[in-house]
Amino acid sequence: MPSGEKTPSPCGYSPFQVGESIRKGNYIRQIMTITLLQQDTLWMDWKANLSKATQAIRRAPGSDLYLLPEMFTTAFLTVPPPQSAYIHDHALDWMRQQADEAHAAICGSMVAPMPHGKYANRMYFVCPDGTIHHYDKSHLYKYGGEGEWYVPGEQRVIVDYRGAKILLEICYDLQFPMWCRNNVDSTGNILYDVIVYSANYPTARHQAFETLPIARAIENQCYVAIANRIGSDQWGTYYGGSRIIHPYGDIIAQGTDNAECEVTGTIDLPALHRYRKKYPVLQDIIWNKFF
């Protein structure tokens, strides 16, 4: 299995602090609601992008998790601008505020400054109680120049949120199945229940984007939620195709192509656990035959 994996970290939930936990929006869910924000991400107009995202969250109240596309503040940047740190700090403050007001987690990627003039394509998962988790994109799209300025992440990150274990992934990671491979740990527990992807997949890669998320759901016996952008920029056009996918491979909810929309669906954790118990295929992975 991939090395450098962080132990699933909880979003502030403690069974001994139930009253405080419920007040801050941290509690165990049997059925979890996820909303994908499929947006036309405007080039370098971070204020407008955050304003649109705020309105989208207001139009879809009551979700446990709101998922945004890749680099939702600026659109996809291969060369980070000088004001990247300023944009990053304001955007992260915005995520904290939205998580608190919506009593839900807010998740999406943006440019994050690193030491020595480098950057990360960083996905933040901000919980209602203010807890922040992050994952740095591991597979950089070198064909598009992403590898010049960005530092690849070296660890997978799994967040334990309202009873669901959620693996954080970004766009191009989708094409590397071993990086997101699910497994059974030493205590017999399956590592994660849901993969969330912030994406910036172009229309030219339509077939891959339609196929790969379904494959990831089936092979890992998990739900997949993937938020993609629409619109166009200097790199091409984007059609959306944001979806929530069942472990069987069925589509639970899907956005309208080439339209801004909020895509909401539910995931059933008890049903997932029953399915895995009935068909325990993850126990049959033979790692030493390949690694």
Model-derived features: where do they sit?
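Active-site catalytic loop in hydrolytic enzyme cores
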Residues: 114-190, 204-211, 274-281, 291
